[in-house]
Design a protein with these regions (language model features):
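Periplasmic solute-binding protein
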Residues: 112
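An acidic/histidine-cluster motif and surrounding catalytic segment
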Residues: 1-104, 115-134
Length: 134
């Protein structure tokens, strides 16, 4: 079973289709052969994500999303995805996209990280960008 919960931390939940979010998360996880998952998507602030980035990755910078898989072993994913609404809004302006589309892209990107995809090299970035067009 796959469950997706939306939460907010210091911000109002964005007006985004929760059914779409649940559906796309379930589709991605199922396509990559994960039938057991619990995802919590937490919409938050730049301050919170910067703090998490510094604490867990030793990098002091703004970021649009951070993903944590809390499950150590097995096929099940117990994931927390933190999303900075301000970064998503800034990204949308930079990439000339509407907020909704950019928010959806960031959610897909975050789920891919939970599945083990990375974006540190140019090859990895290219692969993730292709998969973001889910």
């Amino acid at each position: 079973m796959i469950t997706v919960n939306l939460e907010s931390d210091g911000v109002d939940l964005p007006e985004i289709d929760g059914n779409w979010i649940s559906g796309i998360c379930e589709n991605i996880l199922t396509d990559f052969e994960h039938s057991e998952a619990a995802l919590t998507i937490i919409f938050s602030t730049d301050t919170k994500l910067r703090k998490l980035k510094k604490e867990y990755f030793s990098v002091d910078m703004l970021t649009d999303t951070i993903s944590f898989n809390l499950e150590d072993k097995g096929e099940a994913i117990d994931g927390e995805i933190y999303i900075s609404l301000k970064r998503v809004s800034e990204n949308a302006k930079t990439f000339e996209q509407d907020f909704d589309k950019e928010c959806k892209r960031v959610i897909i990107h975050s789920v891919l990280h939970l599945l083990g995809f990375d974006d540190q090299t140019s090859e990895e970035k290219t692969k993730m960008t292709q998969l973001e067009d889910y």
